[in-house]
């Protein structure tokens, strides 16, 4: 599928609000800007891949489902790194059951390609979509919304 079509699918999903995870306000912290490596949680749980994906999305402001050899994934990570935004990177090619998680992401987002990027509990698209949002000045406000929600949740 072309990048234009993928971007169109991503925009429709974001606009429709169909791709949401658990509690839309996600935990996360601005800081080093470096992504976390995949935890042992992935693939070893008795919960389904979709549930593990949704839990990760709901617990992190920015989640990048990626592969270590993917140049588009590296580009997307660099955008968040350069903005000094912490993100959770889930490297699908490093997981024993990575194909099952990629299949689940395909069902959730309509695309099998990586990266699959979620901000503030919502699917925003792939690398091209993320780059476009950043150039338009819309990416950082999405991240800030998540941190504001997190602060509000901590107060209550």
Swiss-Prot record:
It comes from Mus musculus. InterPro entries: Glutaredoxin (IPR002109), Glutaredoxin_euk/vir (IPR011899), Glutaredoxin_subgr (IPR014025), Thioredoxin-like_sf (IPR036249). The 2Fe-2S present in the homodimer leads to inactivation of the enzyme. The 2Fe-2S may serve as a redox sensor: the presence of one-electron oxidants or reductants leading to the loss of the 2Fe-2S cluster, subsequent monomerization and activation of the enzyme. Belongs to the glutaredoxin family. The gene is Glrx2. Disulfide bonds join 70-73. Keywords: 2Fe-2S, Disulfide bond, Electron transport, Glutathionylation, Iron, Iron-sulfur, Metal-binding, Mitochondrion, Nucleus, Redox-active center, Transit peptide, Transport. Glutathione binds at residues 67, 102, 114. This is Glutaredoxin-2, mitochondrial. GO terms for cellular component: mitochondrion; nucleus. One of its GO terms (molecular function) is 2 iron, 2 sulfur cluster binding. The keyword Metal-binding applies. [2Fe-2S] cluster binds at residues 61, 146. Residues 1-19 form a transit peptide. The modification S-glutathionyl cysteine is found at residue 70.
